[in-house]
Amino acid sequence: MEGNMGFITITKPALKQIAILKNDHENDVHLRIGVRQGGCSGMSYSMNFEHVDKLKDTDERLRLDNFSVVCDPKSLLYLYGLSLDFSSELIGGGFQFSNPNASQTCGCGKSFSG
């Protein structure tokens, strides 16, 4: 089953990889997806596990079977419509971000401008 937050879609392969990575963390964590300044195109994607105590009232949240994905409102402006996928290919593998709001992306796909 894909995860759809209404603003971010997470594919089955991405959900599977997130679940694998989550196993390396304690149980009381969620995955935070966001953007930050930096990267070759001006902004870069961020994904990290953080303790659920850090959840803010303004965060958007998607509850899945064994974890939650959250996003802050400022990042949401840049991520609306984002599709998060995962590829296990040797070249070009890893998490892949497809962002309809990005006017320009860098070659690695991890940085964009909006």
Curated annotation (Swiss-Prot):
PROSITE patterns referenced in this protein's UniProt entry, alphabetically: HESB
Any one cellular-component term (Gene Ontology): chloroplast stroma
Chief site of localization: plastid
KW Zinc (keyword) present: no
Annotated GO MF terms: iron-sulfur cluster binding; metal ion binding; protein-macromolecule adaptor activity
Keywords per UniProt: Chloroplast, Iron, Metal-binding, Plastid
Keyword Plastid in annotation: yes
Binding annotation for Fe cation: C40, C106, C108
Domain of life assignment: Eukaryota
Protein localization: Plastid, Chloroplast
One example of a Gene Ontology biological process annotation: iron-sulfur cluster assembly
Pfam hit, one: Fe-S_biosyn
Family to which the UniProt record says this protein belongs: Belongs to the HesB/IscA family. Ycf83 subfamily.
Descriptive protein name: Uncharacterized protein ycf83
